[in-house]
From Swiss-Prot:
It catalyses: guanosine(37) in tRNA + S-adenosyl-L-methionine = N(1)-methylguanosine(37) in tRNA + S-adenosyl-L-homocysteine + H(+). It comes from Lactobacillus acidophilus (strain ATCC 700396 / NCK56 / N2 / NCFM). InterPro entries: Alpha/beta_knot_MTases, tRNA_m1G_MeTrfase_C_sf, tRNA_m1G_MeTrfase_TrmD, tRNA_m1G_MTases_N, tRNA_MeTrfase_TRMD/TRM10. This is tRNA (guanine-N(1)-)-methyltransferase. One of its GO terms (molecular function) is tRNA (guanine(37)-N1)-methyltransferase activity.
Length: 242
């Protein structure tokens, strides 16, 4: 996969070139192309923004340098803009993007883009209901979530399939040595009846409990089987007893 990122601050993307993603870059499992669209300005001071027509606070990013930067690429693949008004990024989107051969991200700044820049994009995406100073951090998050799904990026190929969100449920609490640390034990907090059912049903009940405790909204978007509904009710009954 090739990923192009149009940005005013290419130095911000150093974190994508270390750890597992960095090793993937070195091994040729994916390619990162950082493009500073300020390089495509024509005026003496290299302006990339201007005041909005009709007045208003802030500055708006111009279409010309961004369009020229896009035109300089041999290909773009799917073009993605980061902006607060976009649809919220999630694991399902990362899985779909990981199937693409090429992605191009355009990072916003200041008061946003000239509307004609949005018209160039295939998707406008946000990472949540809050405002950041620019699109670089959201882009890094989305690139990380997408690239880690590519074959050979993670050490354990099963990790990206079995972890939180990939199956619509959160991971259950996990522990390692020591078994007892400052009086806090690593024993699982399930009653015997629940443990028996866990043995019969794999880890489903632990996943359901973790999701119910921390992100019940995820259960609303999941089509639970009759068996899962039964397990969930038992979890609720158990917690009410406590």
């Amino acid at each position: 996969m090739k990923i192009n990122i149009l940005t005013l601050f290419p130095d911000m993307f150093t974190p994508l070139q270390v750890s597992m993603l960095g090793r993937g870059l070195e091994d040729g499992k994916w390619d990162l192309n950082l493009v500073n669209f300020r390089d495509f300005t024509t005026d003496l001071h290299h302006h990339v923004d201007d005041t909005p027509y009709g007045g208003g606070a802030g500055m708006v990013l111009q279409i010309m340098p961004i369009k020229k930067a896009l035109d300089s690429l041999p290909s773009t693949g799917k073009i993605i803009i980061t902006a607060p008004q976009g649809k919220t990024f999630n694991e399902k989107m990362a899985q779909e993007w990981a199937k693409e051969d090429e992605l191009t991200f355009i990072c916003g700044h200041y008061e946003g883009f000239d509307q004609r820049v949005y018209d160039l994009a295939d998707e406008t995406v946000s990472i949540g209901d809050y405002v950041l100073t620019g699109g670089e951090l959201p882009t890094m998050s989305m690139v990380d979530a997408t690239v880690r799904l590519l074959p050979g990026i993670l050490g354990n190929s099963a990790s990206s399939v079995e972890e939180s969100f990939s199956h619509g449920l959160l991971e259950y609490p996990q522990y390692t040595r020591p078994a007892d640390f400052e009086g806090k034990k690593s024993a699982r907090s399930f009653k015997p009846v629940v443990i028996i059912k866990r043995l019969l049903n794999g880890d489903t009940i632990r996943l359901l409990k973790a999701t119910y405790l921390h992100r019940p909204d995820m259960l609303e978007n999941r089509n639970l089987s009759d068996e899962e509904k039964k397990m969930l009710q038992e979890i609720k009954n158990e917690m009410n007893e406590d």
